[in-house]
């Protein structure tokens, strides 16, 4: 809406993405901080508590903590984006569609867990099906609007090959399949990581900050040309959505830091992972995402290795998976695990940002 003040009334300051992103940050932060206590109070009254695993004794004290806090920061982000974003931009509309759909799937899963008072939730097949369908819709729209299908290796100037060249019945199946995989992997990896107070929140903020920088450069003719970065027309507006989400996450972290007063639930973690994947795809950073989201990669790999090892060797690699539970079983304090993982995420994203210049 603020963009319309520039478009129709010539208020030039609202033409700047950076200014509107700053406004979006504080609006989303304010909404998240203000409404979260009301949500916590309502959730406690409704007994919308996170079912706690009986396998981790240290989590016994978390049993009455409400979940689904992701709904608040997602709505805060959407409101700020609607206020500050250019609603005629296809990437903005697709980004809002992406985060909304994944949040709804996560909310349904949370509701089923709360109703059943266990961690089962939606069946794995149904959850995968819904995530797959939404991912397929989003990636199909990206192809329809002509998004760049080049495959880039981090720190390299030129693409390795064009995924769009591999077609079946005039459909770029390689690009489509690869992007769907990125969506599914990232959304589930963030979901797995969300097991300690604030553990998924700060790495998500770091990832969104880095991806905001990449998307801004991609959408800026001057910067993309100077840095030899692949230009993506109109993508710069996504910075407003990303920065709004960062602001909303800081507001959530105010209540989610140890000891947490609220958990984000699947409604938050699935939506977060999906939006991070979306930003990575738009900025052509699907491979660099392995570094940008290194904590999510480590957490997901620990589960894959644990399950695979037990299935084929009948032996466990870790005391418990995901790996943050392994460290808990080893006697690490929760705060120590969280802060050390945050440090790893910050350092990894600093290295990732170097790829803007080192190409």
From Swiss-Prot:
Pfam families: Glycos_transf_4, MraY_sig1. Its cofactor is Mg(2+). The chain crosses the membrane at residues 23-43, 68-88, 92-112, 126-146, 165-185, 198-218, 235-255, 262-282, 287-307, 336-356. GO terms for biological process: cell division; cell wall organization; peptidoglycan biosynthetic process; regulation of cell shape. It is an enzyme of class 2 (transferase). Signal peptide: none annotated. Pathway: Cell wall biogenesis; peptidoglycan biosynthesis. Its EC number is 2.7.8.13. It is found in: Cell inner membrane. It catalyses: UDP-N-acetyl-alpha-D-muramoyl-L-alanyl-gamma-D-glutamyl-meso-2,6-diaminopimeloyl-D-alanyl-D-alanine + di-trans,octa-cis-undecaprenyl phosphate = di-trans,octa-cis-undecaprenyl diphospho-N-acetyl-alpha-D-muramoyl-L-alanyl-D-glutamyl-meso-2,6-diaminopimeloyl-D-alanyl-D-alanine + UMP. One of its GO terms (molecular function) is UDP-N-acetylmuramoyl-L-alanyl-D-glutamyl-meso-2,6-diaminopimelyl-D-alanyl-D-alanine:undecaprenyl-phosphate transferase activity. GO terms for cellular component: plasma membrane. Keywords: Cell cycle, Cell division, Cell inner membrane, Cell membrane, Cell shape, Cell wall biogenesis/degradation, Magnesium, Membrane, Metal-binding, Peptidoglycan synthesis, Transferase, Transmembrane, Transmembrane helix. Its main location: membrane. It is a multi-pass membrane protein. Belongs to the glycosyltransferase 4 family. MraY subfamily. PANTHER family: PHOSPHO-N-ACETYLMURAMOYL-PENTAPEPTIDE-TRANSFERASE, PHOSPHO-N-ACETYLMURAMOYL-PENTAPEPTIDE-TRANSFERASE HOMOLOG. Catalyzes the initial step of the lipid cycle reactions in the biosynthesis of the cell wall peptidoglycan: transfers peptidoglycan precursor phospho-MurNAc-pentapeptide from UDP-MurNAc-pentapeptide onto the lipid carrier undecaprenyl phosphate, yielding undecaprenyl-pyrophosphoryl-MurNAc-pentapeptide, known as lipid I. This is Phospho-N-acetylmuramoyl-pentapeptide-transferase. It comes from Helicobacter hepaticus (strain ATCC 51449 / 3B1). The gene is mraY.
């Amino acid at each position: 809406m603020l963009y319309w003040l520039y478009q129709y009334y010539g208020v030039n300051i609202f033409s700047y993405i950076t200014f509107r992103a700053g406004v979006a940050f504080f609006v989303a932060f304010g909404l998240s901080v203000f409404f979260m206590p009301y949500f916590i109070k309502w959730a406690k009254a409704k007994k919308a508590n996170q079912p706690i695993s009986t396998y981790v004794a240290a989590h016994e004290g978390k049993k009455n903590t409400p979940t689904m806090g992701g709904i608040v920061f997602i709505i805060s982000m959407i409101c700020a984006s609607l206020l500050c974003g250019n609603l005629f931009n296809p990437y903005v509309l697709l980004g809002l569609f992406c985060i909304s759909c994944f949040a709804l799937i996560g909310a349904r899963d949370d509701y089923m867990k709360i109703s059943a008072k266990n961690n089962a939730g939606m069946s794995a097949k149904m959850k995968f099906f819904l995530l797959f369908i939404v991912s397929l819709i989003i990636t199909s729209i990206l192809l329809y609007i002509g998004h760049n299908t080049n495959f880039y290796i981090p720190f390299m100037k030129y693409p390795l090959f064009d995924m769009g060249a591999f077609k079946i019945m005039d459909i770029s199946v390689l690009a489509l399949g690869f992007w769907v995989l990125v969506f599914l992997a990232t959304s589930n990896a963030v979901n797995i990581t969300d097991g300690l107070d604030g553990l998924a929140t700060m790495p998500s903020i770091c990832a969104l900050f880095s991806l905001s920088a990449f998307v801004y450069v991609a959408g800026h003719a001057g910067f993309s040309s100077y840095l030899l970065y692949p230009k993506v027309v109109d993508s710069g507006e996504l910075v407003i959505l990303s920065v709004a989400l960062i602001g909303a996450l800081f507001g959530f972290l105010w209540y989610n830091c140890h000891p947490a007063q609220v958990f984000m639930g699947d409604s938050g973690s699935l939506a977060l992972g999906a939006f991070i994947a979306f930003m990575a795809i738009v900025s052509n950073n699907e491979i660099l995402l392995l570094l940008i989201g290194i904590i999510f990669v480590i957490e997901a790999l620990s589960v894959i290795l644990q399950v695979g090892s037990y299935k084929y060797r009948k032996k466990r690699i870790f005391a418990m998976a995901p790996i943050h539970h392994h460290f808990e079983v080893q006697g690490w304090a929760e705060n120590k695990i969280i802060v050390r993982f945050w440090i790893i995420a910050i350092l990894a994203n600093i290295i990732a940002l170097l790829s803007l210049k080192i190409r």
